[in-house]
Swiss-Prot record:
GO terms for cellular component: cytosolic large ribosomal subunit. Transmembrane segments: none annotated. It comes from the Bacteria. This protein is located at the 30S-50S ribosomal subunit interface and may play a role in the structure and function of the aminoacyl-tRNA binding site. Belongs to the bacterial ribosomal protein bL19 family. Keywords: Ribonucleoprotein, Ribosomal protein. The keyword Ligase does not apply. GO terms for molecular function: structural constituent of ribosome. The gene is rplS. The keyword Ribonucleoprotein applies. Coiled coil: none annotated. GO terms for biological process: translation. This is Large ribosomal subunit protein bL19. It holds the Pfam family Ribosomal_L19.
Length: 131
């Protein structure tokens, strides 16, 4: 491991120590709370949409969230370890077969929907079934 990789690893550890990001994947619907500074006021702004891409590059990791606002598609790229991100909340898990969902840009309406990932049912064990 060279010096740059070591420094990046330490920086990632320092930035993620005070903030816990949930694990999410492309297809998931997330709410990203962003700290916005307007003049002297500081407030939190929520951006809810579908994760269409995720880029894992250590300190340079990022993800793209897409939403439809007043009939217009809006995409926003967030740096994963940015201090401007207050929190990330996963609303629903999407069941997709691709890592990059750029094809959603060309679709609208029902064809742009993403199926929800269902949790696997746990089979009861023989001991529990015997009772």
């Amino acid at each position: 491991m060279n010096l740059i990789e070591k420094i990046e690893q330490e920086e990632v550890a320092r930035l993620s120590a005070n903030k816990v990001l949930p694990s999410f994947a492309p297809g998931d619907t997330v709410v990203v709370s962003v700290n916005v500074v307007e003049g002297t006021r500081k407030r939190t702004q929520a951006f809810e949409g579908v994760v269409i891409a995720k880029r894992n590059r250590g300190l340079n990791s990022s993800f793209i969230v897409r939403k439809i606002s007043s009939g217009e598609g809006v995409e926003r790229t967030f740096q994963t370890y940015s201090p401007l991100i207050a929190s990330v909340e996963v609303k629903r898990r999407g069941d997709v077969r691709r890592a990059k969902l750029y094809y959603l840009r060309d679709r609208s309406g029902k064809s742009a929907r993403i199926k929800e990932k269902l949790q696997a049912r746990v089979k009861p064990t023989a001991a529990v079934a015997a009772e």
